[in-house]
């Protein structure tokens, strides 16, 4: 059984403007949940708050990973909880490659050969793995590196913000299928944040939540995502 991700009464502000209001969400261990919503609804703010990205201030509320309160933890401490968060605009780190980062991680248990095979399975060129982390990369390249890190570290929980951004249809289907397979093989808990239902056709979420005005206003199964594609968020 995977680890539970629980968010209780989360209030977050960005640049002195409150964006999330008393947000509550529980993703049971091993489940896949999706958050959908219009632009400006607070979707990426939620991911950035979990990641503890600078500029996102948690006013009140708590975030728990398997019962452990991570609300005041640093990004490094959160990573030690075996949790992976992929943001829309990852930090660029010149001089530090993704291989350097993974080598320094205490949660990586794969051999060099296994890591190399994972890179090959994602069609990641060797020079990309040797480049500074997220430096001068396209949106698609960044997403491939995110999934590469995910497959190498095999976290208990992953949060993916706009995985479909910057990817063509074939690449999106390929990467989403790898996330789905890893979740089913390892009981990894997944929270995916997206605008579109297409990725959810592959991820087959247990639950879909609608985020509007900084609050979750509706929850349901995959059929909710299909409904939103037809009716939009105003109905």
Segments from the language model and where they lie:
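Walker B catalytic motif
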Residues: 159-163, 170
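ABC ATPase NBD Q-loop/coupling interface
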Residues: 62-78, 134
């Amino acid at each position: 059984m995977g680890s539970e991700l629980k968010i209780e009464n989360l209030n977050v502000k960005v640049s002195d403007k409150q964006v999330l209001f008393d947000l509550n969400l529980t993703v049971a261990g091993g489940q896949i949940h999706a958050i959908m919503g219009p632009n400006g609804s607070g979707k990426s703010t939620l991911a950035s708050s979990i990641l503890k990205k600078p500029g996102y201030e948690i006013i009140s509320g708590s975030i728990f990973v398997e019962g452990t309160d991570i609300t005041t933890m640093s990004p490094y401490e959160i990573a030690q909880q075996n949790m992976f968060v992929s943001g829309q605009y990852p930090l660029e780190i010149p001089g530090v490659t993704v291989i350097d980062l993974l080598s320094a991680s205490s949660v990586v248990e794969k051999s060099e050969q296994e890591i190399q095979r994972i890179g090959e399975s994602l069609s990641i060129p060797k020079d990309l793995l040797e480049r500074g982390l997220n430096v001068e990369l396209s949106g698609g390249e960044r997403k491939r590196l995110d999934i590469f890190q995910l497959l190498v570290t095999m976290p208990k929980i992953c949060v993916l913000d706009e995985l479909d951004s910057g990817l063509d249809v074939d690449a999106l289907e390929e990467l989403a299928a790898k996330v789905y397979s890893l979740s089913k093989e390892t009981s990894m808990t997944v929270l995916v944040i997206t605008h579109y239902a297409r990725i959810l056709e592959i991820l087959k979420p247990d639950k879909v939540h609608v985020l509007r005005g900084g609050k979750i206003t509706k929850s349901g199964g995959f059929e909710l995502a299909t409904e939103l594609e037809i009716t939009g968020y105003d109905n």
